């Protein structure tokens, strides 16, 4: 990651559940720090909990909902 890559900071407001073939991915709802009215659902690999701040390299894509 170089200094020219634009990133977006987002705060985890709710952990929705585990997904992936072995449950190695967590689906979370995040709220953007710059625009707190906007929330999206993302998939996160690794440990995550409510209140964590994520650095999103791409902030437009939203994850599909769990079944």
From Swiss-Prot:
Keyword Ribonucleoprotein: yes
Source organism superkingdom: Eukaryota
SUPFAM superfamilies: Nucleic acid-binding proteins
GO biological process, one term: maturation of SSU-rRNA
Alphabetical list of Pfam families matching this protein: Ribosomal_S28e
GO MF terms held by the record: structural constituent of ribosome
Record carries keyword GTP-binding: no
InterPro entries: NA-bd_OB-fold, Ribosomal_eS28, Ribosomal_eS28_CS
Keywords: Ribonucleoprotein, Ribosomal protein
PANTHER family linked: 40S RIBOSOMAL PROTEIN S28, SMALL RIBOSOMAL SUBUNIT PROTEIN ES28
Protein family (similarity comment): Belongs to the eukaryotic ribosomal protein eS28 family.
Entries under HAMAP family matching the protein: Ribosomal_eS28
Protein name: Small ribosomal subunit protein eS28
Lineage: Eukaryota, Fungi, Dikarya, Ascomycota, Saccharomycotina
